[in-house]
């Protein structure tokens, strides 16, 4: 598997988690929708499924890890940035095979692509603090 396949999986997962957060739809339905209606060429489908399912099933645990580092309530965080931070926190917590620098860098790049103007700074700040506490 090429690193770019995981990058594409993360990118698709951010979009799917964003959709799930806003719609409240069943995560299996969101997964099906994205796998059938999006271009999944070159995407690590297994990793996409793991990120999507992992964030959905461990949302409360992930949010507990994230919340201490927020300067505002979690429900006030931009939904795109929330999706990105949840994915990165999942990787940092449950995918020890993913180097923390990779997880953070990928999250920053996703925030630059999808987030608000300074969203990448917010994402970086949260994840740096999370890693520092857990190392």
From Swiss-Prot:
Keywords from the named record: RNA-binding, Transcription, Transcription antitermination, Transcription regulation
CDD domains for this protein: Terminator_NusB
A GO term for molecular function: RNA binding
CC terms in the record's Gene Ontology section: cytosol
SUPFAM superfamilies in the record: NusB-like (SSF48013)
UniProt keyword Secreted, yes or no: no
Matches recorded under Pfam families: NusB
An example Gene Ontology biological process: DNA-templated transcription termination
InterPro entries reported for this sequence: NusB-like_sf, NusB_fam, NusB_RsmB_TIM44
Stated family: Belongs to the NusB family.
Function: Involved in transcription antitermination. Required for transcription of ribosomal RNA (rRNA) genes. Binds specifically to the boxA antiterminator sequence of the ribosomal RNA (rrn) operons.
NCBIfam families noted in UniProt: nusB (TIGR01951)
Record's protein name: Transcription antitermination protein NusB
């Amino acid at each position: 598997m090429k690193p770019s396949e995981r990058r594409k999986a993360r990118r698709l997962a951010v979009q799917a988690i964003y959709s799930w957060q806003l719609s409240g739809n069943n995560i299996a339905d969101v997964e099906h929708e994205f796998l059938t209606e999006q271009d999944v060429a070159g995407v690590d489908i297994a990793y996409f499924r793991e990120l999507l399912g992992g964030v959905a099933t461990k949302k409360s645990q992930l949010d507990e890890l994230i919340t201490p580092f927020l300067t505002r309530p979690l429900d006030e965080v931009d939904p795109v940035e929330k999706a990105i931070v949840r994915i990165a926190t999942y990787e940092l917590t449950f995918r020890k095979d993913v180097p923390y620098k990779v997880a953070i860098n990928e999250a920053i790049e996703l925030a630059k692509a999808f987030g608000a103007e300074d969203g990448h700074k917010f994402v970086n700040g949260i994840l740096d603090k999370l890693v520092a506490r857990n190392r």
